[in-house]
Amino acid sequence: RAAFGELDPISPSYRNRDARLADLDAQGVEACFMFPTLGVGMESALENDRPAMLAAFRAFNRWVDDDWGLNHQNRIFSAAYLTLADVDWALEELEWALAHDCRVINMRASSVLGADGQRRSLGHPDHEPFWAALNEAGITLAIHSGDAGYGFMVDYWGQNAEFEAFRHEPLKMLLTYSPISDAVASLIAEGV
């Protein structure tokens, strides 16, 4: 409440796709993308436990499809959330998403931790099979803000690195402002 004041009650359209369609109609909006809120912290929280991370991503995507549909009536396009921490897994999950008429995928704005313990940019050559498949599919890539793993920058400057959604400390914000532009830069610079 300190950050936002009194909040409006949760609208049924936040949790029900038919109510969301009614809101879209009332607002004159043809269609929308839907992105995860709390889901954007999964990769950072679980990157050192690859089986748990991949299971969490898979479960999240199945839940989104069950609850909202990855493509509901060509009007609500829910993003499947993928990671390149395991390219073979990402290709399997992309294939599943495409089979469920997915039109947009979401990725974390960060490098990924490979099975060998080394970090790789999104544009790293090891990820080329995924980018080729995504390009062939012709669907949209979204890079969503969230816990990008930039806590090391905050630690370096003596700040509390714990990620807290909706809490904004000026120095912390300035030290971690660039994950999305960094991710896009890696894709451009490495030829994706």
What is the predicted role of each segment?
Residues 1-192:
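Helix-coil boundary/capping segments in enzymes
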